[in-house]
Amino acid sequence: EPGHDGIGWLAQTGRIPLGYLGDAERSAATFPSIDGVRYAVPGDRVRRLRDGSIELLGRDAATINTGGEKVFAEEVEQALLQHPAVVDCVVVGRPSLRWGDEVVAVVQLRSGDDPSDEELLAEAGRHVARFKLPKALLRCEAMVRSPSGKADYRWARAQAVGA
């Protein structure tokens, strides 16, 4: 329903694949039938706004559960990218005894720039709630991405856990 505060799943109808070969459970989760209509649910979380448009929140696989709250990695990445020194960033969860997972950002800075963590977090804090801010910022010389430009969350998580 437009304007509802709830978060839902992006889904589509039409020409839908039959499913995953040999994986009935995954097929049922990704391609459910609801009231006789078959859907594809790729894992994107969304919110429908009052004007009927859809706000894409992020991939469910990149959602971080921290302190009982869900944090969409893409939302935090966009907030960090608002700082002019940040060229690229990837946000992941890192195991934490206190938080379950804590938000950690791997950031690539513009050559010659060296803002403090406090400066980066202050800018990001203007765009997202404080509980979503990274508990740690890790700097890298070059971000690892797939040939199509997708974030390599596995690499970023390894950086975060190894730090």
Set out the residue ranges of the language-model regions.
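AMP-binding/adenylate-forming catalytic core of the ANL superfamily
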Residues: G3-H4, G8, L18-G19, A29-T30, ...
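Hydrophobic residues in beta-strands and at strand termini
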Residues: Q12, L109, R139-C140
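Glycine-/small-residue-rich beta->alpha transition segments that form the dinucleotide
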Residues: R15
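Short, solvent-exposed helix-helix connector turns and helix-capping sites enriched
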Residues: G22-D23, D152
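A short helix/loop element that forms part of the nucleotide-sugar donor recognition site in Leloir-type
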Residues: A24-A28
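AMP-binding/adenylate-forming catalytic domain of the ANL superfamily
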Residues: V128-K150
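A short, polar/charged loop-to-alpha-helix boundary motif
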Residues: A160-A163
